[in-house]
């Protein structure tokens, strides 16, 4: 009886373990979305980029932003910054 109980518990734990691992399929990489604007990133560049994305894109796109990065860029003696925000899924990526 003790062996039968141990076997049932072992099978149940293996079932839980296998289902947990199976559910972890390939995670899709975040989808980058970028833009350029005048001025420098400043001390809080990611927030600046997020605000610019809010102005440029609709709420459905903005809701899927996970994080943003900002890089200063100087061209033709004009300060600019480049923003890249990463989306969980959806527009402009079509990976579902």
From Swiss-Prot:
InterPro entries: SCRL (IPR010682). It is found in: Secreted. Disulfide bonds join 31-93, 41-70, 49-83, 68-85. Pfam families: SCRL. Residues 1-23 form the signal peptide. GO terms for cellular component: extracellular region. Belongs to the DEFL family. This is Putative defensin-like protein 236. It comes from Arabidopsis thaliana (Mouse-ear cress).
